[in-house]
Amino acid sequence: MSGQTRAVLAAAIFALAIPAAAQAPAPVTAFDGKYVGVSAHIAKSTGHGRQCPRQHAPEALTITNGSVQSSGKEKWTGTVGPQGNVILRNKLSMRVDARIDPQGTITGRYQGPACMVDYVWRKQPM
């Protein structure tokens, strides 16, 4: 391979690498803020002969750059996608699949082996 061919090839590879690096996904900030827990309602008890634990309003969530955290004892963590899809997990590994609507309300459901629980959080004004 001649020196000129190598130079052209190197320039082409370099030129192709620049747009790929420039297309890294931007952080999701449209949903940033604090969301206060509104309710947790047992939607269905699926366990045979087992009682679902009594529910209380979930602890507040803070969303920053697509990352969800809570500081209470339940320790919710998760992610928010660009369309408002939310996946949450707490310290007990409970998974809640949720969505943020245009009004800033997060609604989601936990589907466990014995219970289904519907959760609601509402965004607080800045």
Predicted regions and their residues:
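Intrinsically disordered, low-complexity segments enriched in polar/charged small residues
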Residues: 9-11, 28
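Short, low-complexity, Pro/Ser/Thr/Gly-rich segments in the mature regions of secreted, periplasmic
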Residues: 117-126
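Central antiparallel beta-sheet cores of small beta-barrel/beta-sandwich binding domains
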Residues: 27-101, 107-118
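Boundary of Sec targeting at the N-terminus
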Residues: 23-25
